[in-house]
Amino acid sequence: VFDEVLVFDFQSLYPSIIRTFNIDPLSYAGQRRGGEPTGGSTAQEPPIRAPNGAVFRRQPGILPELLDRFFERRAEAQAKGDAVASFVYKIIMNSFYGVLGARGCRFAGSDLAGAITSFGQRILGWCKDFLEDLGYTVLYGDTDSLFVTVLAGPAAAEARTAAPALLLDGQEICGRVNRALEEYLVETYGVEPRLTLRFEKRYDRFFLPPLRGGSGQAEKGRAKGYAGLLAGEEATESPAADAHAGATPTGNASAATTSAGTFDLRKRIEVRGMEAVRRDWTDLAHEFQLRLLELLFLKRPLEEIQGYIRELVEALYRGELDDKLVYRKALRKSISAYTRNTPPHVKAAALLPRSEQRGLIRYVITREGPQPEGWISAPPDYDHYLERQLMPIASAFTEVLKTDLEALFGRGGQLWLF
């Protein structure tokens, strides 16, 4: 868990790369071989070479000019408050990269699409190095974003003492990066930069789970997988919520308070790519993960978290959470089409009347296997939900809590039940 994390992203990164580096089927001059691009160039007008080796002439291409117009139209739509038009232009602009990598497009080419992604990686890498030279630590990055902690490292400690407000000023940091990036692109590639890094948000606390089966900082985080507590007033639970934190396993303690009044802590928690926002996990798993995040962001002691987990599991085995055990998965083809293997939702669908064997299948794992909701004839398999829903989620928290699953759940997962 990290404190004070700033999130930066590039506005329309791939379209901006196409515009900046003149990436276009007509300007493409081949791959550089033996020091020269296969398509030739002139000494007066040296070509632009992408990190993947693709070379582009500087004569303006069609796609960059189209994107210039679309950027202008989108800016006009945003100025008018026309959210629909702005969204349409955004989708169209982002599709340019997709069609260049799609076989069905007559202008597609792996070198063109590869040039865009390689420039993206080069630019994100340059920004990461620049920020770290300033004393910040880049925790995580995806296609067009960087997550930066400002309260780490000796350089940051020195800056924190000298100018704490400036250290947390995302707009100021953006300005420094953009000015330096512009100089780098002009000096290195001789282009007119059209790339703009934006300050998106700040998290008071930020959780980056490790990869399943991995450990260590290098293996933390999955693509789009993280959770953060959006910046706001200091999060402290109210006495009433605190008293019921363990008594109601499903998250009764989401209410929090400050000296200014009461607010809902859970509304400030953003989750991306984790089980809490995935439909193929049960409500039991969703609420369990959100509650663990709340306790983590509130900096609750390990004993309190263990107590919450214990009461949750006891409630599960008492049958008090049966309404939260439903899986939901779409049936995308007929049951008879599943020949090699039969997934649980297909087995459940096979028990339904033929007229209902379609669309979203809601089912429960019972002691007799998966059964569709409304047609359940056997008790739920609580061991399944403990081992497949609760324990995998808890495993992501063991490193930050400096414990293990045995300590959280008891040996075998349910030691206290016997």
Identify the function of each model-found stretch:
Residues 54:
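Active-site loop/lid in soluble adenylation, ligation, and acyl-transfer enzymes
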Residues 58-105:
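Active-site cores of enzymes that catalyze phosphoryl transfer or operate on phosphate-rich substrates
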